[in-house]
């Protein structure tokens, strides 16, 4: 965490209350809006003489900005000059910055572009709980807590810029970034501080009520006393134990003692009473169509789950082995030993879900309800201990023992290392009398379109032409019979004799009659 506000003043000047030209009449901004706008635009001198704001009030607001406005990361509260009049009212402030405005604008664009990656995936029709949950999981999966930075004071990535660049940081990095993204989509949030535990997290307002959210603590890290970690992050895993908690719930552990919200008073967090099957999810949650999906190794779940409302859940694939003594599912090795956890990630690409078990990496096509194993060569004698995915790039960890010993990392790219596997033809646009339609073949793995064909407009179709040669004869009859028998999967649209959108035995009978001259 940052230390408490430290404002450096090079000079404080007192001036008499003599008459000055009025600016406030021309400027309807409050002093808070004026200060925020000035820092946001990297102004070096702020004239506040007609706002009649007390110095203490202004400095209280500056402290609020320092902690609660992460987009002002470039401002370290270095005040070069503070001038007040004989009434203790602030006249002007002079600031210094550690970079140029041009550099800041480039950085600001980078921050917006990086956070757009998650914002663009959020449906405006989701509830605020679902939006906050999705962002919580995105941060947990794509970023990691960095103990190296924490152990070296002065090197921590506290601000959102370096956190988004390095994908690593400390608690304040998570909290600042979470707060920034939430506010961009219209959800209010503040930074919470426990100086006693040197820790920071957020409060979030959902449907008018406030809750604690600690993304840092929900991003599990590998930490075994006396042993150097191979990989700090449990790759792909997400916890939800610190999502939407009350004041009394957040202090039940030893890392949230005597907390306060810098610059903000009166917020009381209460217990969440909505549907919350996500609490036992061990991966990020993903929305495809009308369902949310996640992995859950709790006793009453044990696999890939889906739900429409986070109340009524359905297991669509059992994963792992249920160990009665522990009360949850884990990895089962060939020698009979059990790893009491899902060391797994769940990711969405093109509407397909990718996840791992101890021995396989699967892709689930929710549209067709099809599971397929992804053709990746698991290292001999090793089991999967984590999965991550960035676009088409799949990264995994594998080990014969655990995450502390003999860990290897592998990387595969869909469409490159994993070749496309085509589906059957699917019509994505039906032809009309005057307009062509289109049919495509998708890849089973990545859902990319790997082949396209135009379906001629109905006015140009020769009814009975099953093989596309624009002639009608017994060859078309044979092609149609083979298609209906499942032997031939290719058929021309002309075989749909009654134009009902389906090719079946009725069309076969009609074609026979046509060839017979009826």
PLM region spans:
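Repeated scaffold domains used in trafficking and secretory/extracellular systems
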Residues: 275-287, 322-348, 378-391
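Cellulosome-associated attachment modules in secreted, modular CAZymes
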Residues: 19-23, 458-518
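Hydrophobic/aromatic-rich core segments of domains that either
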Residues: 173-244
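Hydrophobic core
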Residues: 9, 13-17, 182
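Secondary-structure boundary elements
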Residues: 100-163
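Residue position within the beta-strands of beta-propeller blades
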Residues: 293-296, 355-356, 395-398
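Extracellular modular ligand-binding repeats in secreted and cell-surface proteins
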Residues: 418-460
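Linear, non-domain "peripheral" regions
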Residues: 4-5, 18-117, 306-309, 318-321, ...
